[in-house]
């Protein structure tokens, strides 16, 4: 019997449905917490992909009207996860991206879609499902943010509440006139509640009303308390600083294991790095790059957005050509960046290759085949790509922000002398500083003994969920003890 029961509320979860790192965290953390005596059940919307994969499902909350049509709650399992599923076809039975119309705009009913998720989470928190009464409700990102409000304003004795910020840039702000329609009482629309500059703030509600706030790296926890990175919420976060903690993410080291990865060409580990070049050759072929084992091959797996700094990399294409460096990019996002990237690939055949979209298998192949992974983010709450790069023997080249600063040891002179470097950092995140760091990478590439030492250091780094899970478990235990 587990000592603490947690209900996680998420809008996506790997391997059922994924648009970003939130899904990876939601999918991997429950198993890691089980080893700490924490039992996690996860509430997720009944998207088509979820409904197709859930097994042994039984109805635990009967159908009732919810924003225009009946909805019910199922409990079942998929991929080893204990799941509650909000089965509401009128809200979730839509193809493609779970948040966006095909033209990239938000679904206009998103406030109701995710309020429904939060109201269901609140009901489960109060024991609406037979045999399940969680000690803690753990809400992830803005889509789950109103759960704290529904629990707070209900008036009954409630479970503890924890809000996790995966990216403060996405806040879920909606018109104030929706307050009643969303089932919130008038008193909720206050500075201490859901009100946020005249709107209803889903994430703001979570940050104001939750017992604890976590975010996904210590550096990001400090950054978001500043006007530069606080996205308008820095004042609130400063007032709640004693309730805020940064806990680094891990990765699922069974899914991300180069020694047994079925998605890559040639499995390898730190003892068999001589096998790794076969993956590089396959990657060059996949992206239409020249079959040159001696060329430094940079990989990118990213959203194509201003935040991720892909424009900084595109500004250095002439430099990469002078250095004889190749580039393979997997990503999707802002149309202008997509256009520039495709133009670069067309103008530089054999040197630049691009696949637009997201493909899990190609992401694994880039990690296994690229010599280095470039992550030039202007801000980065944690980042998982650099953790995968460490595990797969690709040198992370990262901006010194957020979780990138916390997880990569820059190979400066002191680190090289001490034998502890694991990658390259640059600051500030500008095109010129990235260019200088790419030149530094090219110089290190020309010294195979040093390069190999950095790669081996990275592969020996523990990037699993073991330590983060222990920190979450302590947070949950402390909260239960205080209540």
Swiss-Prot record:
Enzyme Commission no: 2.4.1.21
Pathway where this protein functions: Glycan biosynthesis; glycogen biosynthesis
Keywords in alphabetical order: Glycogen biosynthesis, Glycosyltransferase, Transferase
GO biological process: glycogen biosynthetic process
GO molecular function list: alpha-1,4-glucan glucosyltransferase (ADP-glucose donor) activity; alpha-1,4-glucan glucosyltransferase (UDP-glucose donor) activity
Coiled-coil annotated spans: none
Alphabetized InterPro entries for the sequence: Glyco_trans_1, GS/SS, Starch_synth_cat_dom
UniProt entry tagged with the keyword Glycosyltransferase: yes
GO cellular component assignments: cytosol
Catalytic activity: [(1->4)-alpha-D-glucosyl](n) + ADP-alpha-D-glucose = [(1->4)-alpha-D-glucosyl](n+1) + ADP + H(+)
Keyword Nuclease: no
Residue positions binding ADP-alpha-D-glucose: 18
Matches recorded under CDD domains: GT5_Glycogen_synthase_DULL1-like
Domain of life: Bacteria
EC class of the enzyme, as a word: transferase
Function per UniProt: Synthesizes alpha-1,4-glucan chains using ADP-glucose.
Entries under PANTHER family matching the protein: ALPHA AMYLASE DOMAIN-CONTAINING PROTEIN, GRANULE-BOUND STARCH SYNTHASE 1, CHLOROPLASTIC/AMYLOPLASTIC
Family listed: Belongs to the glycosyltransferase 1 family. Bacterial/plant glycogen synthase subfamily.
The protein's name in its UniProt record: Glycogen synthase
Source species: Methylocella silvestris (strain DSM 15510 / CIP 108128 / LMG 27833 / NCIMB 13906 / BL2)
